[in-house]
Amino acid sequence: MAKMAAALHILVKEEKLALDLLEQIKNGGDFEKLAKKHSICPSGKKGGHLGEFRQGQMVPAFDKVVFSCPVLEPTGPLHTQFGYHIIKVLYRK
């Protein structure tokens, strides 16, 4: 079972925007460019890169998705207390 992961994410306040961004990404949009333009998370400045983190380091709902969704497939929107996330897991190990 994976204990570490690396992921990108885009965090926005509105679900509609999250859905629109996910659609753009699935249609070939550049995840990192969209993160830089739209994400309200400080990681947006780095293209949404969260770096590598341990299982259990993130809020539970985010953690659950990161450690269960398909790798390299944009997933979301996931609602947490921070807003709506679009997540792309780069790897798990």
From Swiss-Prot:
Q: Which reaction does it catalyse?
A: [protein]-peptidylproline (omega=180) = [protein]-peptidylproline (omega=0)
Enzyme superclass (EC): isomerase
Enzyme Commission number(s) of this protein: 5.2.1.8
A cellular component annotation (GO) from this entry: cytoplasm
Q: What is its main location?
A: cytoplasm
Please, which domain of life does this record's source organism belong to?
Bacteria
Q: Does the keyword Endoplasmic reticulum apply?
A: no
Q: Which UniProt keywords apply?
A: Cytoplasm, Isomerase, Rotamase
Which InterPro entries does UniProt cross-reference here? PPIase_dom_sf, PPIase_PpiC, PPIase_PpiC_CS, PpiC/parvulin_rotamase
GO molecular function terms listed in the Swiss-Prot or TrEMBL record: peptidyl-prolyl cis-trans isomerase activity
| Keyword Cell inner membrane attached | no
Kindly give the Pfam families that the UniProt entry links to this protein: Rotamase_3 (PF13616)
List each copy of the PpiC domain by range.
Answer: 2-91
Q: Which SUPFAM superfamilies match?
A: FKBP-like
Q: Where in the cell is it found?
A: Cytoplasm
Q: What does this protein do?
A: PPIases accelerate the folding of proteins. It prefers amino acid residues with hydrophobic side chains like leucine and phenylalanine in the P1 position of the peptides substrates.
Concerning its family, UniProt says: Belongs to the PpiC/parvulin rotamase family.
The protein here is known as Peptidyl-prolyl cis-trans isomerase C
Q: Which organism is it from?
A: Salmonella typhimurium (strain LT2 / SGSC1412 / ATCC 700720)
Mind giving the lineage of the organism this protein is from?
Bacteria, Pseudomonadati, Pseudomonadota, Gammaproteobacteria, Enterobacterales
